[in-house]
Amino acid sequence: MDAVSGGSATGTGEQVNNLRICRAEYRSISRFVEQLRPTRQCMKTLQTHFTHLPASTLLSIFSQEYQKRMKRSMARHHSPEVLRVYYQRYRDEAETRATEPLLLELANQVDLSPALLARLMLECFLEERNASVPSRQVLNNMLREPYLIPDLVLAKHIEQCTVNDCCYGPLVDCIKHAIGLEHEDTLRDKLRERNLSFLDENQLRVKGYDKTPDIILEVPIAVDGHIVHWIESKASFGDDHSHNTYLNEQFWSYCNRFGPGLVIYWFGFISELDCQRERGILLKDGFPTDISSLCAGPQR
């Protein structure tokens, strides 16, 4: 399972259009999103420019591209000297402009995710207050529940960052998890509608499997003429970086262990990535319609 942040803009069970896009178009979109910040407004901008793609696909593409951007710049923002400058700048501003969205403004000025900046500033505050580096658990708890932060002004500013960041933060993590589960439920429902017997990830773990796809079919099926033993649900867009990572960390091992399978990128994928069918990995942007049981004929 994997999911994109944000709301589910399209139904999980119905295809609104073909969500495969060529690599050239993907690059055009990725160049466009370089100028955008991770705010709710950015989605309106994307939908205005790319009207043929649903919001869920655009959000997934933007989120993945923005996360790449943040990873490239993270070392610069994590420098102790830079952090001291950011923190002191925030504390000085909070003295006179406490009611303003100071951390959101600072995040925009230094080109850093609001939720990531909030985490860094909270860490600086707790380290200054307690003279020790806070644990990850303490940080996570306070980011999830800002009322736990002793400084009420800082708590308000951190909450603003969490609410307004569509790529990072505890709120986004919860939404991503929920969307991932929603699409897994849709996959199971589609299989049951076609009377296809399967074991899901939870059932496989009970049987002692550790690393498994979302679905193992008890009786293989054929999709587009290719045999499928397993299905993996990805509530995200399949770009080069994410797909290659999944190939190396998941899909090839599934193939070696269970045979050929199907990956569903519910929010679409780069069409050129569907090039491993002969090696056992088939890509789809929704539940397939061309399904044949290997022992019972076409499914109705």
UniProtKB/Swiss-Prot annotation:
Localization (cell): Nucleus; Cytoplasm
GO cellular component terms given for this protein: cytoplasm; nucleus
UniProt keyword annotation of GTP-binding present: no
Keyword Cytoplasm part of the UniProt annotation: yes
UniProt keyword annotations, A-Z: Cytoplasm, Nucleus
Domain of life of the native organism: Eukaryota
One Gene Ontology biological process: erythrocyte differentiation
A UniProt-annotated Pfam family: TPD
Entries under PANTHER family matching the protein: CDAN1-INTERACTING NUCLEASE 1 (PTHR31661:SF1), SIMILAR TO CDNA SEQUENCE BC052040 (PTHR31661)
Function: May play a role in erythroid cell differentiation.
Name of the protein: CDAN1-interacting nuclease 1
Naturally occurring in which organism (per UniProt): Danio rerio (Zebrafish)
Gene coding for it: cdin1
